[in-house]
């Protein structure tokens, strides 16, 4: 039976680039009706210990937490990230995949759909846990097998979701971010362009560190992740007549690619200058984004109509 479910799920799954938490990808690989407008237009406020002023490790971990590049196999192809199941550190109660979930907010993480090597032959969806206050725990995971947050994080990436072995810096960053998630009640807010652009500025601020330290590998890794987040925004401007907004976002992505290329060539002054220029452009974006916003998929009614159309 599990093999049949796996075959149906894989047959329905599009092959997507490993970019950000993909709106298009999520709508295509989830069965119709599984993903609600509510889940796509509202999320809990993040509320980090210490506010928005965080160390590089926390900011890099925050970016990685939202990047499908952390995962592998089906999850990465579908554009999923840690954020998909743990929105801003809370349990995503609307997450649901028929055949893998017993109810909204649950998922079978030991299924071949995610990792052939992790298949246990048992239908055992688990309730998605909140990561709030995780730094105070002495055991991790619903089975409490992991003795440290670092061990638990690695297991999720490698064993459950077939990701590549994370290096020490990446694990340090992911742990640092999770340890800043305060144990508070969820307060919901709209998913907004304003917040997404503010997040981009935070990612670009963090990117200044590897450029200042002249670390080309880390700079390239971060630019790939940030370009993915721009791709997420790009999907919200879905109409063909939004060429101005779409073109602007594509140009920002190209500028990041050039920064990575300059870093790879050791052109550090040029890379740092280009990053400063890009930060200024995003801090004061052209009016075209605001003009197109009422017709974008940030608007719940527009999104509802878009979801109801046949899968593209």
Could you tell me what each predicted segment is?
Residues 1-3:
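Positively charged n-region of N-terminal signal peptides that target proteins for export
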Residues 17-312:
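Periplasmic c-type cytochrome electron-transfer domains
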Residues 5-7, 79:
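Short alpha-helical "patches" and their helix-cap loops
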Residues 7-15:
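Bacterial N-terminal signal peptides
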């Amino acid at each position: 039976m599990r093999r049949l479910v796996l075959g149906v799920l894989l047959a329905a799954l599009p092959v997507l680039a490993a970019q950000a938490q993909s709106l298009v990808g999520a709508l295509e690989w989830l069965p119709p009706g599984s993903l609600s407008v509510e889940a796509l237009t509202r999320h809990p406020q993040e509320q980090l210990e210490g506010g928005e002023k965080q160390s590089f490790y926390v900011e890099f971990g925050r970016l990685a937490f939202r990047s499908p590049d952390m995962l592998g196999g089906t999850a990465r192809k579908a554009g999923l990230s840690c954020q998909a199941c743990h929105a801003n550190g809370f349990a995503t109660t609307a997450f649901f995949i028929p055949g893998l979930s017993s109810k909204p907010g649950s998922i079978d993480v030991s299924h071949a759909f995610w990792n052939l090597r992790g298949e246990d032959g048992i239908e055992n969806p688990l309730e998605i846990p909140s990561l709030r206050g995780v730094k105070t725990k002495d055991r991790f995971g619903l089975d409490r097998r992991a003795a440290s947050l670092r061990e638990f994080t690695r297991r999720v990436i490698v064993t459950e979701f077939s990701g590549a072995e994370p290096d020490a810096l990446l694990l340090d960053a992911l742990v640092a971010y999770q340890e800043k998630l305060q144990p508070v009640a969820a307060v919901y807010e709209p998913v907004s362009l304003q917040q997404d652009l503010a997040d981009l500025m935070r990612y670009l601020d963090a990117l200044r560190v590897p450029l200042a330290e002249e670390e080309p590998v880390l700079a390239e890794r971060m630019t790939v992740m940030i370009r993915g987040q721009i791709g997420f925004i790009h999907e919200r401007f879905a109409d063909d007549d939004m060429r101005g907004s779409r073109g602007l976002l594509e140009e920002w992505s190209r500028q990041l690619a050039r920064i990575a290329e300059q870093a790879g060539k050791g052109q550090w002054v040029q890379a740092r200058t280009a990053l400063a220029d890009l930060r200024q452009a995003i801090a004061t974006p052209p009016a075209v984004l605001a003009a197109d916003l009422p017709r974008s998929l940030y608007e719940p009614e527009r999104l509802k109509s878009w979801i109801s159309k046949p899968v593209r």
